[in-house]
Amino acid sequence: MKKSVIALVVVAAAGGGLYFANMQAENAIKQQLEQANQSYRDMAADGEMPEISLSYQDISANVLTSSYSISGLAVAMGEMGTVATADIVQMKGLQPQGLSDSGSVKISGIKAAAAVLQMLPPQTSAYLQGLALHGDYDYAYTDSGELMFNQQTRINDEFALNYSFSLAQMQQFWQFAKEISALPPEQQQALAADEAYVGQMLEKLATGALKNGAISIENNGFIERTLALMAEQGQTPDFATAQGLALANIAVIEQIPADMKQSLSDFISKPEKLSLSFGFTEPLQFAKVQSGELAEHMVSPEAMIKFANVKLTAN
């Protein structure tokens, strides 16, 4: 019996401790949002930007999984009121104050608010009202100095822009970033406007190198639908005419290799997916780019394409 009571006490204490830790994490995020709003108010008062403020419906945190979420996020701008909303922002591996070696952010359901829609022509307003923007971002840093990050931005299920990059020799930059992120938010905001800080950051970044990367566009009717609306309003030619003009322009560009021209032409003729990738035999050191040591590889588009081993494929 005593053992059961002790076990219950331990479980209750652990549960209470977890609840308190989660509440503290939620309060830290709320404080950061309020500090961001105060910073926006200060900059608006100084005439540096319009008056912007952030609000939310709910914030939750789970310190065991290092995950946080902000529901019902809204962005307001001065007298216009709410201009954009997001259903939910989910973060994992991120710290309210500090920089973890891996993390991710997912934003779902970004939409234009009524204050924006009512300012637009009826057709444009109806079109924009049917669009929802979604974003996924993640990064990872390893002890070997490699930093990898990926992002996907989607519009409904009609369009996606994806990219991923891998960098090397990022130890100095990452250490600098960790030190800065450990500072209080107000101190970080002050440093962002400090030229000396920006110079230090660029100096640390120059010690790194770019290994490889990829960018892709996926289209499922979004380009056609957007051009149709713009053509209806007299802003652009119709889709078929725009296709013809684009194909004619590609045909006369001499600096692009024939296989890349073909890929571009294939995508324009049937806009489904266009992918570009590159990778260096040895990581491209930013310091060498700055110093001009790699000038021989930058003399022409052809030289750059060969140096970076650029590949372009369609559909």
Regions found by a protein language model. Give the residues of each.
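Positively charged n-region of N-terminal signal peptides that target proteins for export
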Residues: 1-4
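Glycine-rich, small/hydroxylated-residue low-complexity segments
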Residues: 7, 12-315
